[in-house]
């Protein structure tokens, strides 16, 4: 691909980004990313987050979901966040930087969490996309499997789970796996999710334990 094509593509992305009403609204409201509107819409429909809850936020950086979760759970609740990327501190959020796929990082995260005491696990994780679907989809599915494994280790009975999943190979099997573990499972495509994106959010409540 030529430099001109790359530059043109980058230019279009930047223009779309800065013209995006959700980007502008996030900046106006003091949130770190437009992704906050995805969890806000899920919350408005499904009421996952309540005062006093303990929440685990996977793939948290730059922190939009954690910001929103802290507002919902209040001073009596807690948010434990993890990402491979750095994240500026947020009051009320315990942040661990590291690769969630590494056992040492997972162990460090689990040390901050009491077993069976987490009310909500939420994951907005996504791999670095190469543009090659045959490579990207398995990477994405691996991450959502890890998020589901986290539920098995820390989620309280009747707890909730929301996870970003890319539609494609492995999606149907994963959805069935989630349905086996939770009483109610819904698929959401938030308004703020770009129409061309394959992403959807699985929202699962009533963890069977």
From Swiss-Prot:
SUPFAM superfamilies: S-adenosyl-L-methionine-dependent methyltransferases
Active site (record annotation): 164
UniProt main location, coarse: cytoplasm
Catalysed transformations (reactions): uridine(2552) in 23S rRNA + S-adenosyl-L-methionine = 2'-O-methyluridine(2552) in 23S rRNA + S-adenosyl-L-homocysteine + H(+)
EC number, as in UniProt: 2.1.1.166
Top-level EC class: transferase
Pfam families: FtsJ
UniProt binding sites for S-adenosyl-L-methionine: 63, 65, 83, 99, 124
Subcellular location as annotated: Cytoplasm
GO cellular component: cytoplasm
Keywords per UniProt: Cytoplasm, Methyltransferase, rRNA processing, S-adenosyl-L-methionine, Transferase
Annotated GO MF terms: rRNA (uridine-2'-O-)-methyltransferase activity
Transmembrane segments: none
NCBIfam families: PRK11188.1 (NF008390)
Family: Belongs to the class I-like SAM-binding methyltransferase superfamily. RNA methyltransferase RlmE family.
PANTHER family per record: RIBOSOMAL RNA METHYLTRANSFERASE, RRNA METHYLTRANSFERASE 2, MITOCHONDRIAL
Its job: Specifically methylates the uridine in position 2552 of 23S rRNA at the 2'-O position of the ribose in the fully assembled 50S ribosomal subunit.
Protein name: Ribosomal RNA large subunit methyltransferase E
Record organism: Aliivibrio fischeri (strain ATCC 700601 / ES114)
Taxonomic placement: Bacteria, Pseudomonadati, Pseudomonadota, Gammaproteobacteria, Vibrionales
């Amino acid at each position: 691909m030529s430099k001109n094509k790359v530059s043109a593509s980058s230019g279009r992305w930047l223009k779309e980004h800065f013209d995006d009403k959700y980007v502008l609204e996030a900046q106006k409201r003091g949130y770190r990313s437009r992704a906050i509107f995805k969890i806000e819409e899920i919350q408005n429909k499904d009421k996952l987050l309540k005062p006093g809850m303990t929440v685990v936020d996977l793939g948290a950086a730059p922190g939009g979901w954690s910001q929103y979760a802290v507002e919902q759970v209040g001073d009596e609740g807690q948010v434990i966040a993890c990402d491979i990327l750095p994240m500026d501190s947020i009051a009320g959020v315990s942040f661990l930087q590291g690769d969630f796929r590494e056992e040492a990082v997972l162990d460090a995260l689990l040390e901050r969490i009491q077993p069976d005491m987490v009310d909500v696990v939420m994951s907005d994780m996504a791999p670095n996309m190469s543009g090659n679907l045959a490579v990207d989809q398995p990477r994405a599915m691996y991450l959502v499997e890890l998020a589901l494994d986290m539920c098995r280790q820390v989620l309280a009975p009747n707890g909730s789970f929301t996870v970003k999943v890319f539609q494609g190979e492995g999606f149907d099997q994963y959805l069935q796996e989630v349905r086996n573990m939770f009483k109610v499972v819904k698929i959401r495509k938030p308004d703020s999710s770009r129409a061309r994106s394959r992403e959807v959010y699985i929202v699962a409540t009533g963890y069977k334990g």
